[in-house]
């Protein structure tokens, strides 16, 4: 049960500190929709998505009205489509992508994920065909999101697929060049991808998640920043404790929404993702929290330390506030979506290399990084390989969402609008990793995988 005091505190956090719920995501299994006939699969899928998510928008609006708590996005996550379309032609796959996008528009769902594949080991011809369809699938849709998992701590890293994905990302950028290569913002490459992630572009409904469930993603960097502003001369352990307490309060709001949405939609409750997700608004930034902790400018020395502290405190505080936690759970550092990170890029203190170091202690990885459009595909592949190695060898989720903005060079401006914000094109290291990437093959799992 939630006390009246908790509800009053939540209302105050909304009014004063930009607290919101980033997403209510309905996860739906499509295994019982599968068919060798693409149109039959599409028809079955449509019926099932409408059955479970048809009332999602109305319920989210009802929650906003009842609790005064903004629900920024309504989303749907599907069983990875690659598991259901082995026999489909390239053209069939694009038809499926278009159908999913149309369903999302009809239900007024902001984003729909699950055009996904897991390729930890063998890169077979069916999966290669599916991944090759991703550029056209994203170029011909508006709300569809796609992801590929290329490595796990238990299985190792698939360099063959990483090599291919450099060219795939370049192709997405070219095919969506009229929108500053926006298609790349709807595609992410993972290591150790979670099955219950409510956040896009990496959300999909895992095979062990049941027929349907609801997962909630919280937000609230502004709440943490406001609390830290009152702790100007506090010791670092007091700072840690303050973050932990604020994370507890933010997560309680997420748990409240999860329980209410589950009851109204008559769908089992899944998890609350304990992630602090920034927005382009000033005052709603992870970078500003790091600077409030004591870093002069994000990207300067001490940034990784401050981020590690923040990430751990958020997890510890949030874990006490929710019945079930999961997803990515930590602090997000998407450059274009965080006004403070954008300032760091513009001032030169925040580099790609520093961001990579930060990903070793935070929730995701190199996220919403805009790089020059003429970057070689092998450089993108090597960027992915570096980040995947951090995830696989440290037994954590990492990801890469990089935008090689077509026709743009270092220092140019790119603006995606909305939650995705905008950023200057970042400087990259131009040394060639081509010889490394062209070796191909698989990297065996690390010794820490032998845990039984």
From Swiss-Prot:
Q: Name one Pfam family in it.
A: DUF711
Q: Which domain of life is it from?
A: Bacteria
InterPro entries hit by this protein: UPF0210
Q: Whom does it interact with, and what assembly results?
A: Homodimer.
Database matches in HAMAP family: UPF0210
Q: Which family does it belong to?
A: Belongs to the UPF0210 family.
Its recorded name reads UPF0210 protein Athe_2116
Q: What species is this protein from?
A: Caldicellulosiruptor bescii (strain ATCC BAA-1888 / DSM 6725 / KCTC 15123 / Z-1320) (Anaerocellum thermophilum)
């Amino acid at each position: 049960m939630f006390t009246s005091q908790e509800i009053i505190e939540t209302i105050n956090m909304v009014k004063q500190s930009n607290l919101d719920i980033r997403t209510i995501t309905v996860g739906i299994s499509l295994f019982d929709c599968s068919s060798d006939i693409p149109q039959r699969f599409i028809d079955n899928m449509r019926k099932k998505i409408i059955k479970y998510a048809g009332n999602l928008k109305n319920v989210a609006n009802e929650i906003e009205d009842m609790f005064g708590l903004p629900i920024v996005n309504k989303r749907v996550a599907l069983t990875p489509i690659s598991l259901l379309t082995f026999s489909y032609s390239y053209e069939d796959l694009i038809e499926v992508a278009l159908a999913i996008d149309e369903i999302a528009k009809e239900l007024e769902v902001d984003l729909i994920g699950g055009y996904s594949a897991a390729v930890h080991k063998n890169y077979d011809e069916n999966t290669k065909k599916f991944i090759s369809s991703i550029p056209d699938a994203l170029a011909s849709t508006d709300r569809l999101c796609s992801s590929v998992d290329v490595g796990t701590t238990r299985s190792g890293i698939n360099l063959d697929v990483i090599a291919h994905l450099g060219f795939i990302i370049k192709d997405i950028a070219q095919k969506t060049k009229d929108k500053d290569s926006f298609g790349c913002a709807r595609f992410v490459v993972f290591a150790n991808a979670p099955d219950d992630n409510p956040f896009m572009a990496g959300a999909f409904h895992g095979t062990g998640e049941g027929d349907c469930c609801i997962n909630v993603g919280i937000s609230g960097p502004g709440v943490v920043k406001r609390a830290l502003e009152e702790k100007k001369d506090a010791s670092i352990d007091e700072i840690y404790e303050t973050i932990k307490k604020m994370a507890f309060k933010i997560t309680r709001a997420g748990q409240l929404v999860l329980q209410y949405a589950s009851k109204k939609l008559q769908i089992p409750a899944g998890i609350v993702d304990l992630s602090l997700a920034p927005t382009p608004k000033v005052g709603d930034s992870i970078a500003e929290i790091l600077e409030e902790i004591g870093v002069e400018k994000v990207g300067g020395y001490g940034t990784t330390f401050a981020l590690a502290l923040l990430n751990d405190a958020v997890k510890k505080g949030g874990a006490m506030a929710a019945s079930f936690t999961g997803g990515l759970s930590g602090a997000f550092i998407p450059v274009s979506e965080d006004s403070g990170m954008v300032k760091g890029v513009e001032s030169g203190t925040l580099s790609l290399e520093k961001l990579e170091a930060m990903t070793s202690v935070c929730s995701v990885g190199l996220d919403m990084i805009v790089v020059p459009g003429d970057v070689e595909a092998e450089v993108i592949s090597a960027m992915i390989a570096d980040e995947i190695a951090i995830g696989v060898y440290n037994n954590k989720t990492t990801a890469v969402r990089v935008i090689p903005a077509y026709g743009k060079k270092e220092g140019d401006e790119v603006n995606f609008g909305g939650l995705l914000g905008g950023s200057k094109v970042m400087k990259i290291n131009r040394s060639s990793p081509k010889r490394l990437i062209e070796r191909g093959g698989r990297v065996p799992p690390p010794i820490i995988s032998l845990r039984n």
